[in-house]
UniProtKB/Swiss-Prot annotation:
It is found in: Membrane. Keywords: Membrane, Transmembrane, Transmembrane helix. This is Putative uncharacterized membrane protein YFL015W-A. It is a single-pass membrane protein. It comes from the Eukaryota. It comes from Saccharomyces cerevisiae (strain ATCC 204508 / S288c). Partially overlaps YFL015C. The keyword Transmembrane helix applies. Residues 54-89 are annotated as: Disordered. The chain crosses the membrane at residues 25-47. GO terms for cellular component: membrane. The lineage of its organism: Eukaryota, Fungi, Dikarya, Ascomycota, Saccharomycotina.
Amino acid sequence: MIKKSRTYYPSFGAYFHLLPAHPNAHSVTLLFGIFRSSPFLLLFLLIHRKVGEGRGSQRMKKKRGRANPSENLRERADPTNGPAENGKKGSVMCGCQLAVAMTTC
């Protein structure tokens, strides 16, 4: 009987059998490896991913808001409904992800 060679991920450890079921198996293993080597790098990546998503959504919002320029100006002038609220939402999401990352690993 021919034995198939299997790639072993030391950072993943006992959870290796869960990898094939996960769609992003390699990225999960990579994240586990990064977290094991330096947790601060993983936190840095998480925070910057959120910041990048925020920028993209604002860019799309500007493109869509061309039809009514007065409403667009009002939204920009009002700090309570404008970017400040979006920033709060992003930071809350970062906090949630941070808490999950700290408790799971």
